[in-house]
């Protein structure tokens, strides 16, 4: 198992994100042939003697995913079928095995498994996922002090909880989004208002900046706003004076307020209220 000293001597900012090929060529192969690994951060743990939620505390390294070297327990002494039973459930293979290549050479196999609580076949599926890596060769491994083991008796397991990993990815996306400049757009600046008699009139938004006024196509130019020849067409409907501005109708009181009372405020205050 990895000691604290090994973890503490890792360089600042170190992240362990090996590729499938690197896991096979530099870690599992070395472990199976009794050679030292590039870094002693993957402990030897029999993952089938624990439930998956107990495994993170068995290693000093890893936050969202954890790596282990584990002996490949077989269901029958002379058989090849693995025993995947755990303490309170079992690991069930899902999908098809994936071949791992180093260049054009076939070097290993990757298998995906899901943990189920209870006994088969009525176990309850959980969010715990295992990727099991094993070597493709089957030559004899050198004898170890604790006995002889075949090359494929060692597997490398990557274990993680599906929701935790998805949440971490989602948080990374949120952080990226918050760093991008936010642009607010204004749509439909004029709203239809239904009068008491059922007729529709147009209502201006409550707040509007000077730049917004200048950009509104339906207002025309500022000079047109104060041009008596084409701006004032007073009509009387339901005892309400209405003003036609370039074909759009709004209450005469609002237009009068805009023209007479609030013109000076537009240049002083970027936010202007019509009502």
Curated annotation (Swiss-Prot):
Q: In which tissues is it expressed?
A: Expressed in roots, stem, flowers, and leaves.
Q: Where in the cell is it found?
A: Nucleus
Q: Summarize the record's disruption phenotype note.
A: Delayed leaf senescence (including delayed leaf yellowing phenotype under darkness or after ABA treatment) but enhanced fruit yield and sugar content, likely due to prolonged leaf photosynthesis in aging plants; these phenotypes are increased in plants lacking both NAP1 and NAP2.
Q: Which GO MF terms does the UniProt record name?
A: sequence-specific DNA binding
Residue ranges flagged as DNA-binding region: 107-168
The record's SUPFAM superfamilies line, in alphabetical order, gives: NAC domain
Q: Which PROSITE patterns match?
A: NAC
**Keywords for this protein:** Abscisic acid signaling pathway, Activator, DNA-binding, Nucleus, Transcription, Transcription regulation
Keyword Cell inner membrane set for record: no
Q: What turns on expression? A: Accumulates during age-dependent and dark-induced leaf senescence. Induced by abscisic acid (ABA).
Per UniProt, residues of the NAC domain are 10-162
GO cellular component terms given for this protein: nucleus
Q: Name one GO biological process term.
A: regulation of DNA-templated transcription
Relay the domain remarks: The NAC domain includes a DNA binding domain and a dimerization domain.
- Record function comment: Transcription factor that binds DNA motifs 5'-CGT[AG](5N)NACG[ACT][AC][AT][ACG][ACT]-3' and 5'-CACG[ACT][AC][AT][AGT][CT]-3' in target genes promoters. Promotes leaf senescence (developmental, light-induced and ABA-induced senescence) and regulates fruit yield and sugar content, probably by establishing abscisic acid (ABA) homeostasis. Activates the expression of senescence and ABA associated genes including NCED1, ABCG40, CYP707A2, SAG113, SGR1 and PAO, by directly binding to their promoters.
- Identification of the protein by name: NAC domain-containing protein 2
């Amino acid at each position: 198992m990895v000691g604290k000293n090994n973890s503490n001597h890792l360089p600042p900012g170190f992240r362990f994100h090996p590729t499938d090929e690197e896991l096979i060529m530099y870690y599992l192969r070395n472990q199976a042939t009794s050679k030292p690994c590039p870094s002693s951060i993957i402990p030897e743990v029999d993952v089938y003697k624990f439930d998956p939620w107990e495994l993170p505390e068995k290693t000093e390294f890893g936050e969202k995913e954890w790596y282990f070297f584990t002996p490949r327990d077989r269901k029958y002494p002379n058989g090849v079928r693995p025993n995947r039973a755990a303490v309170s459930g079992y690991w069930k293979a899902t999908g098809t095995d994936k071949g791992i290549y180093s260049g054009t050479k076939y070097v290993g196999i990757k298998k995906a498994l899901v943990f189920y609580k209870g006994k088969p076949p009525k176990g309850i599926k959980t969010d715990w996922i295992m990727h099991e890596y094993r070597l493709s060769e089957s030559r004899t491994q050198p004898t170890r002090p604790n006995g002889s083991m075949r090359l494929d008796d060692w597997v490398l397991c990557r274990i993680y909880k599906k929701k935790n990993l998805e949440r971490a990815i989602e948080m990374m996306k949120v952080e990226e989004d918050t760093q991008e400049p936010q642009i607010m757009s204004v749509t439909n600046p004029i709203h239809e208002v239904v009068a008491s008699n059922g007729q529709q009139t147009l209502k201006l938004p409550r707040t509007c900046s000077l730049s917004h006024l200048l950009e509104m196509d339906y207002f025309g130019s500022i000079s047109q706003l104060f041009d008596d020849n084409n701006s004032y067409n007073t009509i009387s409907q339901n005892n309400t004076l209405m003003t036609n501005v370039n074909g759009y109708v709004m209450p005469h009181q609002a237009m009068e307020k805009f023209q007479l009372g609030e013109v000076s405020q537009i240049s002083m205050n970027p936010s202007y209220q019509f009502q």
